[in-house]
Regions:
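Short conserved loop adjoining the S-adenosyl-L-methionine
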Residues: 101-109
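Class I SAM-dependent methyltransferase SAM/SAH-binding core
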Residues: 52, 58-102
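C-terminal alpha-helical "lid/dimerization" subdomain adjacent to the S-adenosyl-L-methionine
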Residues: 148-183
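A conserved beta-strand element that flanks and buttresses the S-adenosyl-L-methionine
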Residues: 116
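A short glycine-rich, Lys/Arg-flanked "PGG" loop and its adjoining helix->strand segment in the class I
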Residues: 130-142
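Phosphate-coordination loops involved in phosphoryl transfer and adenosine-cofactor binding
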Residues: 48
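Short catalytic micro-motifs in class I SAM-dependent methyltransferases
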Residues: 119-120
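Conserved class I S-adenosyl-L-methionine
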Residues: 1-45
Length: 183
């Protein structure tokens, strides 16, 4: 996995890199735009508009919520990505921190109508994902929802086929979801 310095270096070309991967239907961002659009519609359908974004990157999705008048909160571990996102959303409350170690205290002091995690949870082991998601649930308002968009596969076979097709582009440090076939 890239460390925060790696993401800082990638930040200025991140949006273009994601777009090219999606346009070419290539790992890891194949289907990115469609997933983000679907998630965007679901979040806006929520009754309130306090949104927490975990690992928001350059703010591709989060800035769309911001433009619709949502109150934006977020945590990312790349200072450069935060800088780029903050320029798109001057009033957003964005914090730097490694969410694998938990949220910064300022974010834990709020409650949210929607918590969004896109292309971020794959940095956690399955056990860490479960613990982190459990820690997020009390931060949701009564009718709040948690939305996850990430690389995932219907079967282990699909995951292995993608790994083979991606070749040297495959990031073996990332932990993607795929159910195990029954034996």
């Amino acid at each position: 996995m890239l460390n925060n310095t790696g993401f800082d270096l990638w930040a200025d070309g991140y949006d273009k890199s994601v777009g090219l991967s999606d346009e070419n239907d290539r790992y890891p961002f194949a289907g990115y735009r469609a997933m983000m659009n679907a998630l965007y519609q679901r979040v806006l359908a929520q009754s309130g508009h306090n949104v927490l974004d975990i690992g928001f990157g350059t703010g591709i999705l989060t800035s769309r919520f911001y433009e619709q008048g949502c109150r934006i909160y977020g945590q990312d571990f790349s200072a450069r990505m935060i800088e780029l996102a903050q320029a798109k959303m001057p009033d957003a409350r964005l914090y730097q921190g490694d969410f694998s170690k938990g949220l910064v205290p300022e974010l834990c002091a709020q409650q949210y109508d929607a918590i969004v995690a896109t292309y971020s949870l794959h940095h956690l082991t399955d056990a860490q994902k479960i613990g982190f998601l459990r820690a997020l649930l009390p931060l949701l308002k009564q009718d709040g929802c948690l939305f996850i968009g990430d690389v995932a596969f219907r079967t282990r076979e699909e995951l292995e086929a993608c790994r083979t097709a991606a070749g040297e582009d495959w990031d073996s440090d990332e932990i993607y979801s795929a159910p195990t076939s029954p034996r």
